[in-house]
Amino acid sequence: MVKYFQVLWSLLFSIMLHSMLLAAPGARVWWPTHGLIKIKCPYKKVKLSWFNKTVDPCPGLKQPICGTNFVTYDNPCILCVESLKSGGQIRYYHTGRC
């Protein structure tokens, strides 16, 4: 079971890293617009609605970010995972706490 989560975490991180590298600088899809880390979350391409666990692909990163569901997430990576789980219904709202 642990190996399964390690593989899933690695896959999610690779998807987000790949998206970060392919995005054009200054594109509006970056979450958040300012901060230590910005990601381009592929919520239109990747569906994780079947996944009901909480995963932090960026452990140790504290960069509060508010989602459109008015929940504060510890960092953009966690928000992206929640966005993938919701099929894109939860997205970036603003930087900082809600």
From Swiss-Prot:
Q: Quote one Gene Ontology molecular function term.
A: hydrolase activity
Disulfides per UniProt: 41-80, 58-77, 66-98
- Pfam families (alphabetical): Kazal_1 (PF00050)
> Where is the protein localized?
Secreted
| Residues annotated as glycosylated | 52
Record keywords, A-Z? Disulfide bond, Glycoprotein, Hydrolase, Protease inhibitor, Secreted, Serine protease inhibitor, Signal
Does the record's keyword annotation contain Glycoprotein? yes
Site positions for Reactive bond: 60-61
Q: Which domain of life is it from?
A: Eukaryota
For this record, the Gene Ontology CC terms, alphabetical, are: extracellular region
Supply the Gene3D superfamilies for this chain. 3.30.60.30
Q: Which PROSITE patterns match?
A: KAZAL_1, KAZAL_2
N-terminal signal peptide = 1-23
Indicate whether Chloroplast appears among the record's keywords: no
Domain Kazal-like intervals: 35-98
This chain's function reads: May be a serine protease inhibitor.
Q: What is this protein called?
A: Serine protease inhibitor Kazal-type 14
Q: Which organism is it from?
A: Rattus norvegicus
